[in-house]
Regions:
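Residues embedded in well-ordered regular secondary structure
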Residues: 1-45, 232-238, 253, 546-565
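Extended hydrophobic/aromatic segments used for targeting, binding, or gating
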Residues: 38-81
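Extracellular/periplasmic, surface-exposed regions of secreted and cell-surface proteins
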Residues: 14, 65-70, 74, 80-84, ...
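Short, cationic motifs built from Arg/Lys/His that form the positively charged side of catalytic pockets
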Residues: 30, 47, 54-63, 305, ...
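Low-complexity intrinsically disordered tracts that form flexible linkers/tails across taxa
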Residues: 87-100, 506-511
Length: 570
């Protein structure tokens, strides 16, 4: 049974933590330490090489929070946290690729139980020489070496809160600085990747043993297993070394004047992210928010943000986006008093919002240099020019333009419209919402390599903001909550979302037929051939439209593919 041969019946996994908290009038403190261990579910066989492979995970977390009451109106918060995690795995599987992980599991489900044993008494590993792709998962786990990957995280957070009521009632300020670091060390352990092992197969018909290594090719004597692995001291992975600096200043004001409630907020934030030796990325935001409500009945809100990103040229680096919202708490109106008193209507609110949001996401990796400096021309050094028809290369190295910039690259913009109703009836028995939404995304980023530009352009064209998509739909939510006299509770949540999108503008080829363009269809719309039944005779076969690929393989019984544009070729 390969499952029993590969997996333990159980494994150990545990967590231990200790917390301490307390304080005085001047300082309040909290500290904690936490340890996590995850054991290995695989059985690890003795490989005879002096080390044990397999999997494991250990992590320790520590945290300290200190709140200092510097004055009656000033509070300083210092939060420090760190963790150290060690992940152990076979050296050959530290990359965690799908193929490598599959090799650890394949024996449990792909190998018959009577083909070979995982390991024989003489230390050799089972094999099946008649089929090349049979995998001994026990060998894959036990050999190859063992590696430790150590991940260290350090997080610091300093916050200063100041009550400014001596200036005006309800005014306060808050400033935060955060500094986070991540370090990853790889390649510490034993590298035994390319050292051969002895394999054996026993013929079930004759009982004859067959060894893969019949003799040592170096000296001609019987093959013996030696200790040929090497130790690796480990090294910090520059590509996974991350440093994030974030600082923020915020001003808040909350005030009530009778039935009039007013709030205002102003915020500045800046973020610097760095990875390895790559230049840091920068993002800066200035934002404000104002709200007003009268007697918790009529609501109005206005927001604005002045966002800046290093990914755009100075002319387009900053952009202003704003939004507004209104609301009406119908259930608080005097004419709804009867329904409130009879506990028919708990809450009924109508709301609507409209606004803009900007995005500077030009690709999945913010440190990707091919998409980070798209607003400027890029240059590269290397290569030689060809001097003549004999392909003789020049002795001089090229300094060439590697990418054409576009200084007009700018923010992608989404305009959002939402109209909704929130409700609660019969003391919370039924509650939920109904919402209709419509988004129009414009200035969609199109990478130069994805543009519809003729090949005679001679290179990769500059990237552009050229695209527009509309999305609309609705969301329904219903919550049921009922508690009976015996404290039995019945509850349920139901939700439904329906959305449709349509490409309004796309960088389609100008002369391409409409049915082959993206514009006018959904995003990533699937397309396929249209058939008109089967080819039923050779007359129909020879009269069918030609296929632009493998036309000679077309036979009676195949689909008759419709020549949609009537040019005689499918």
């Amino acid at each position: 049974d390969w499952q029993k041969a590969l997996f333990k019946d159980n494994t150990m996994s545990y967590n231990a933590n200790i917390n301490i908290s307390g304080g005085t009038k001047f300082v309040k403190y909290f500290a904690s330490a936490d340890y996590v261990h995850e054991g290995d579910l695989f059985r690890v066989y003795d490989n005879g090489r002096g080390y044990n492979s397999g999997y494991g995970y250990d992590r320790i977390n520590v945290r300290s929070n200190l709140d200092f009451n510097i004055t009656k109106t000033t509070v300083l918060k210092v939060n420090l946290a760190g963790s150290n995690a060690i992940r152990k795995a076979p050296w050959s599987n530290t990359g965690h690729s799908e193929w490598q992980i599959g090799q650890q599991w394949s024996g449990a489900y792909n190998i018959a139980p009577d083909v070979f044993l995982p390991q024989y008494s003489d230390g050799s590993w089972g094999m099946y020489p008649l089929v090349s792709n049979t995998t001994n998962s026990a060998e894959n786990i036990s050999l190859g070496g063992t590696m430790q990957v150590t991940t260290t995280r350090i997080n610091t957070d300093f916050t200063l809160e100041q009550d400014l009521k001596f200036i005006t009632k309800g005014l306060s300020a808050r400033a935060t600085v955060s500094w986070d670091n991540v370090f990853v060390e790889n390649n510490r352990g034993i590298n035994d990747l390319f050292n051969s092992a002895q394999h054996k197969w026993i013929d079930p018909d004759t009982g004859q043993e067959r060894y893969e290594q019949s003799y040592d090719t170096n000296n001609g004597f019987d093959w013996t297993q030696g200790v040929n692995w090497s130790t690796s001291p480990g090294a910090v992975d520059n590509g996974q070394t991350v440093r994030n600096l974030y600082y923020q200043a915020q001003l808040n004001w909350v005030r009530s004047f009778g039935k009039h409630n007013v709030t205002a907020m102003g915020l500045f934030s800046r973020q610097e992210n760095a990875r390895g030796s790559v230049m840091p990325t920068y993002r800066e935001d200035w934002a404000f928010r104002t709200t007003y409500n009268y007697a918790d009945r009529y609501f109005i809100e206005y927001n604005g943000a002045y966002n800046g990103s290093e990914k755009f040229s100075p002319e387009n680096r900053f952009a202003f986006f704003n939004s507004g919202a209104i609301g009406w708490m119908v259930s608080e109106e005097p004419f709804m008093k009867f329904f409130r008193e009879k506990k028919i209507v708990d809450m009924l609110k109508v709301r609507a919002s409209y606004g803009e949001i900007g995005s500077d996401q030009l690709g999945p990796d913010p440190f990707d240099s091919s998409r980070r400096w798209l607003y400027m021309n890029q240059w590269a050094y290397g290569g030689h020019t060809v001097m003549d028809l004999n392909h003789t290369e020049s002795i001089y190295t090229w300094y060439r333009e590697s990418a054409i910039g576009n200084k007009d690259i700018q923010w992608e913009v989404v305009k959002k419209l939402n109209i909704g109703i929130d409700y609660s009836f019969l003391e919370g028995l039924f509650a939920g919402s109904v919402e209709f939404f419509r988004d129009v995304r414009s200035n969609i980023f199109v990478y130069g390599g994805d543009r519809s530009i003729p090949s005679y352009f001679g290179g990769t064209p500059p990237s552009v903001n050229k695209g527009k998509i509309r999305t609309s739909g609705y969301e329904l939510e219903l919550r049921i909550n009922k508690t009976f006299a015996n404290d039995l509770r019945l509850w349920g949540n139901f939700s439904m979302t329906h959305a449709r999108n349509k490409v309004l503008v796309k960088d389609d080829q100008a002369l391409r037929p409409a049915y082959q363009k993206s514009a006018g269809h959904s995003v990533n719309q699937y397309t396929s051939y249209i058939d008109a039944g089967f080819i039923q005779s050779y007359d129909q076969l020879f009269g069918a439209p030609a296929h632009d690929a493998n036309d000679s393989q077309k036979l009676v019984g195949d689909y008759y593919i419709v020549d949609f544009n009537g040019d005689g070729v499918v």
